Amino acid sequence: MRLAIDTATSRLSVALGRSSTGAIHEAVDGARQHAAALLPAIDRLLSRAGVSRDAITSVVIADGPGSFTGLRVGVAVGKALVVASGVEFWTVPSLLTRAIVGSAPGRITVGLSDALRGQCYAGAWLWLPGGIETILPPEARTPASLRAALPRPDAVIGELPASTAAMFAGWAPYLDLAHHVDARWMLDLVDRPGGAHRVADPLAWEPDYGRPAEAQALWEARHGRALPHPSRGGG
């Protein structure tokens, strides 16, 4: 069974299963709850499935961009599970788990999340019969620059404050900017070329925080080293 973990936003989402179909899921709202809630949520999923942690064959982590503190919670737990059990370690762009909701062959879909400061984290993907092609890699953008870079996508899925969401009115035929993250979709991306990425060295891997944050600066000062910028193509 695959265990999917998304702690990139204020909603903690975990799922257990082979694919989104038939998977079991738990969500906990509140960014400050992630550290205390993640392991109990995983244990509840295992209990509901009637299995132990030995049944987990791979761990799939949402790798950002998103909250520095939230991402580190998911990364720490995911790495610990992988190192302890030797199972596969996969990563998925957090925005891709939103964009898949509007996917269909030939469609370009956009995943969005709030980046504060009048910006949003955005990424765009083209869905092909044989895989997924990145059109715009995930990064922080202003609504105006995003609309200029991609004039007419087919679907836009994300979660934004009302003031930011209003700037995307009429941008796409399908627009859902009140979509809660759901880790079940991450399970499907492991089987899609261009979706999830298998990491060969989990201990050396770091997620995509999107941009430096105060929490990141404090972490680097405490540990005496800079966090590397992740490469989705390596590792």
Where are these regions (language model features)?
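Oxyanion-binding and handling regions
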Residues: 1-22, 29-36, 90, 94-235
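Phosphate/pyrophosphate-binding loops at sites that engage ATP/ADP/AMP, CoA/4′-phosphopantetheine
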Residues: 42-57, 146-154
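Charged catalytic carboxylate motif
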Residues: 37, 41
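Short glycine/serine- and small hydrophobic-enriched flexible loop segments
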Residues: 43-44, 83, 188-192
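Generic structural marker for isolated residues within well-ordered, non-membrane alpha-helices
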Residues: 42, 78, 161
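DPxDG-like acidic metal-binding loop motif
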Residues: 60-89
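Phosphate-handling active-site elements
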Residues: 49-54, 82-92
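Short glycine-aspartate micro-motif
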Residues: 2-4, 56-62, 70, 109-112
